[in-house]
Amino acid sequence: MAVMEFRGAYDYLSNFYPSSIEFDGITYCSAEAAFQSQKCADRKLREQFAGLTAVKARHRGRQVDMRPDWEQVKLGIMERIVRAKFTQHPELAGRLLSTGDLQLVEGNAWHDTFWGVDLATGDGENHLGLILMRIRAELLAAT
């Protein structure tokens, strides 16, 4: 069995879920805001994402000059941010653990086949889902 979308009862798995996160000394309103900020090489620019909603951060992240190593570092950054989200919020960690051994799939209709899976075609690498399952395993091992 699988969780196919990070909505409804599973909305907390989404990076757009409103939960504060401290990352590299800056507190953001969501994991998405933290992630989008990391596209900027300059800390002052990253700080501008701190008060943005997830939607506004995603929009702003599409307008910044991306750091030159972004493609090489984005997976590691995402994993660190998602780990921070769940370790900083024990109630969210408990909810993640409650998914047991369900496969976590970031199914979407916007054709993101890197972080998720296109629900129309079933294609996708599902990197966000894989990160969540790794973090779930880490949390389970720590209990």
Residue ranges and their predicted role:
Residues M1-T143:
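Charged, low-complexity intrinsically disordered segments
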